[in-house]
Design a protein with these regions (language model features):
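Short pre-active-site segment immediately N-terminal to the catalytic Zn-binding motif
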Residues: 170-186
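Hydrophobic (often cysteine-bearing) scaffold residues that line and stabilize catalytic clefts
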Residues: 107-110, 183, 187, 213, ...
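Post-HExxH zinc-binding segment in Zn-dependent metallohydrolases
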Residues: 207-244
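Active-site recognition of the HExxH zinc-binding catalytic motif
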Residues: 118, 184-197, 218, 222
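N-terminal low-structure segments adjacent to metalloprotease catalytic domains
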Residues: 1-18, 26-112, 116, 120
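Long, well-structured alpha-helical subdomains associated
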Residues: 231-284
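Auxiliary, metal-adjacent structural segments of Zn-dependent hydrolase domains
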Residues: 103-166
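Sec-exported extracytoplasmic/periplasmic mature domains
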Residues: 119, 123, 195, 199, ...
Length: 284
């Protein structure tokens, strides 16, 4: 057989056998049009991009480093010129400051976005009315029975709480939180409401034991909010949240790690495996 390599103009198909590109073909313009139509962001490219960003942050991001300050909302490392200290001692990066959610109308819109996203991504719906209330930090933490003490490390301060009173459901959210943090908090609390509606709570307690019960609930809620951020294309914030949660020595961190074992994270903008929403009797 003839193994001789053909000339370039005969191998490069867009030249159509000519030595140069035919003048009638406007390839650069066609490429630009395809980009404007979003054709350069297919699922395979998105998966590669998400995986690359996740791997880069996994290698470079180290939470809780001595002498390093972190944004208490998105977890990014701070420099003095790019951050502010809030009245309660929390530190916030400028990006989180610019995207702070300040009105109840914004929160209600965010809740609708979260509800649509959970149905699209996880195939679940919240089938009961949920009252969304914006409160200050003092009232929120009074509801939780907690006191917040700020530190230099990423303080995983609770930004919301889901409350069930009989057949009434509500979510309290702290005002002034950044949009993405607020959205992730909403998904976390909406996951709890979904659990209240779909799980047999007594059966869950019997199956996993009282000592592991909180890990089952909180681990899934953390998995849900972080996976949601990945699916939204917010890979950097999702990965930082994943790393910070993995090292937590509480029901959130321990539960999250257990869920990761059964339900690995999908770094693309589509799910690549099962979710805990699919098994109501044995989620973990």
């Amino acid at each position: 057989p003839d193994l001789e390599r053909k000339p370039y103009h005969q191998r490069y198909y867009l030249l159509y056998g000519y030595a140069e590109q035919p003048q009638d073909l406007h390839l650069q313009e066609a490429l630009e049009l395809l980009r404007q139509l979003g054709c350069d962001g297919g699922s395979l490219k998105q998966a590669r991009d998400g995986q690359n960003v996740a791997e880069l942050i996994e290698k470079s991001y180290v939470p809780n480093r001595q002498g390093v300050h972190y944004c208490d909302f998105c977890g990014v490392e701070l420099t003095g010129a790019e951050s502010e200290v809030l009245s309660d001692g929390r530190e916030r990066c400028m990006n989180c400051s610019r995207t702070a959610v300040k009105t109840e109308a914004e929160f209600r819109k965010l809740y609708q976005d979260a509800a649509r996203g959970m149905e699209l991504f996880y195939g679940v719906r919240i089938t009961v009315p949920v009252k969304i209330q914006m409160v200050n930090a003092k009232r929120l933490h009074r509801s939780l029975g907690k006191t917040f003490v700020p530190t230099a490390k990423p303080d995983g301060r609770t930004l919301g709480v889901a409350i069930k009173r009989g057949n009434d459901y509500s979510i309290l959210l702290e005002n002034g939180s950044p949009r993405m943090s607020s959205l992730m908090t909403l998904v976390h609390e909406m996951t709890h409401i979904w659990q209240y509606l779909n799980w047999d709570m007594d059966a869950i307690r019997r199956k996993y034991g009282a000592e592991m019960e909180l890990e089952v609930y909180e681990g899934m809620a953390k998995w849900s909010e972080i996976q949601y951020a990945y699916l939204m294309g917010e890979t950097a914030e999702a990965k930082r949240a994943e790393i910070c949660t993995r090292v937590r020595q509480d029901e959130y961190g321990r539960g999250f790690v257990k869920y990761l074992t059964r339900y690995p994270m999908s770094y693309a903008t589509h799910l690549e495996g099962a979710t805990p929403f699919e098994d109501k009797e044995t989620p973990l």
